[in-house]
Amino acid sequence: MKWPVRVKISVGLARGLAWLHHHNKRFRVFHHNISSKCILLDRNFEPKISNFGDAMFMNLMNGELLELGFDKKDVYSFGVVLIELVTGKETINASANSDRTPFSLRDAVDKSLIGLGFDGEIFEFLSIACKCVQSLPEQRPTMLQVYQTMRATGKKHGIVDDH
């Protein structure tokens, strides 16, 4: 799969999760089972999130439930999917590599992507993935932060369009 398609999938997934987590201040959805197996692609490679069987639908009249970190599980799982998109391989234990930031994962980047003019963006996305799979949930960004960073990176490189 070419890099621009992987970017489209990953940014679309980040946008969808950010919407579920942040669209409505009073009502949030936490998927709790994000993996590459629950991401469906339409004919234009737009990702669709499926498998909401373990999802938590929360009415957040106050912010106390966010302190429990329900959103950070989705961030971690998104990071795993992003690593899979960058490496082209299924990830087993991403947190073991997260503290060593891209250096241990650099060698795992799908070799078919290197040298095609996207190397900077590939390693920026890999860095984002490493932040998402930090072992301590409070060190992980929010999905809105992830989406905004990925979108800005993609736009800077001319790959992401506005939705």
Enumerate the language-model features and the residues they cover.
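Cytosolic eukaryotic protein kinase-like domains
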Residues: 1-8, 45-163
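A broadly tuned "polar low-complexity/structure-edge" signature
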Residues: 18, 25, 87-90
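A structural signal for long alpha-helical coiled-coils and helix-turn connectors
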Residues: 18-21, 28, 151-154
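Catalytic-loop of the protein kinase fold
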Residues: 21-42, 46
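Conserved hydrophobic alpha-helix
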Residues: 13-23, 132
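Active-site loop and adjoining helix of the penicillin-binding protein/serine DD-peptidase-beta-lactamase fold
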Residues: 13, 34, 86
